[in-house]
A protein has these predicted regions:
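Feature detects long, helix-prone N-terminal segments enriched in hydrophobes
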Residues: 1-155
Length: 155
């Protein structure tokens, strides 16, 4: 099942998104500096870029499953693309180490995971069908203009 159909699916998606963000950018703490698996893998040729693309792809897929707004998915895709391009700077002679350090410092996965989680928080997910009382209540609030959140029906 690709699209989330229940609040349990949404809970699992959120856990997955947070896990990817934390593993990528928040595993080891050196005072105010936080490093993750991505920063360590960045210094192995091509492994950091492959990890970045896979982890970023998983974040985008989970965002699609949670039906976050397209603008959020575009921003996440942009961040992951920029992060991957920075990481490929090691292919240019003379700037390899600088590019590796910049890629390790750019926390694109954590930022992207936080953007997806925030978009999920700003969405009212309704589990049910058109005949349910909750559906009618939300529809009335939307028509009256009192519901300011984005509404997504899971059923």
């Amino acid at each position: 099942m690709f699209i989330a159909r229940s609040h349990i699916d949404l809970h699992n998606i959120r856990q997955s998104v947070e896990r990817i963000g934390n593993i990528s950018d928040n595993v080891v703490h050196f005072g105010p500096v936080k490093l993750g698996l991505e920063a360590v893998l960045e210094f192995v040729p091509f492994v950091g870029e492959i990890y970045s693309v896979i982890a970023g792809g998983l974040l985008i897929i989970e965002g699609m499953r949670a039906r976050v707004p397209g603008t959020t998915l575009m921003a996440v895709t942009f961040l992951i693309g920029v992060r991957t391009l920075i990481g490929t700077g090691n292919l240019v002679p003379g700037i390899g180490v600088i590019a590796e350090i910049a890629a390790a410092a750019f926390r694109a996965h954590k930022i992207s995971a936080d953007m997806i989680a925030r978009a999920m928080d700003d969405t009212l997910y309704i589990e049910g069908h058109k005949g349910d009382p909750e559906y009618a209540d939300v529809l009335a609030r939307v028509r009256a203009g009192t519901e300011k959140r984005r509404v997504v029906y899971l059923g």
